[in-house]
Structures are given as C-alpha cells and as structure tokens.
Amino acid sequence: TLSKLCGILGKMWTFRDAADPRAQACAEAEKTIIEAIIPDGNALRFNIYLSGIHEKLADIALASKDYDTAVKELKKALDYAIEMEKAQTSGKQYYACLILDHYDYDYSDSRQWGSYAKDLLERLSENIKYNPIRERKDFKALYD
C-alpha cells in the first residue's frame, strides 16, 4: 500500500543525517510519489507524511546554511500539519484522486492524537538546530 511505501521511504530519510544526500533523495522521492498518486492535493492522512518530509527538507536546508529555503520548508510543514488537523476533525473522508478514489479514511479514532501543528512548533522552539533562523521575521511568523 501507499502507506507502507511511504513508511519505508520515511525510515530511509528519518534516520539519516541532514547532510547525507541520500536523506534528501529519499524525502524527495516520497514527496514525489505522494504528489503523483494524489495530484489533487486531497492528501487526507498523507498530510502528516508531507509535513514530516518538509520538516526534513528544512533540516537539509539548514545543514547547507540555506536559511531562506529552511523557513519556506518549515512553513510548508506547518501548513500540512494544519491540514491534517482539519481532516481529523471532519470524520470520514474519501480520496478524490483516481488511484485512491475507492478508499476512505475514518478519523473518528484519531481525534485524540493531539495537535500536529502544536507539536511541530514545540519542536522548533526547543531544538537548538533552529537557532540560526530563530530571530528571522519569517520564522517568528510561523507562531502567529
């Protein structure tokens, strides 16, 4: 299934150092696969995968001191986390894309999982790796 494939790719980039080019290759591959299968953006629970991917891409940009890209990727990560929360509160939903159009996802059991956006913002505020961008206006805007 798509979840298992994303999980495998996710493990490949999650446990690699941000400076490792294989981390970026795996994250980009997972993102490309999700976007190819779900081109309409109705990602439902795959929003959390996309949030994690963009968080990793931000880490990769930080490692190369590309702070503009890092903040842009963190904004995307936060946007996907917020979309995941919106999907969770809506109950049962259906994918609209051709490949997954016969699948649905029932969020009724996942409503107690918490706030993905809040968790992401906590990680950003607690982790020292974000110190180089912490004082930027665009980084601070993530908390607005």
Predicted regions: what they are:
Residues T1-R136, K140-D144:
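Alpha-helical protein-protein interaction modules
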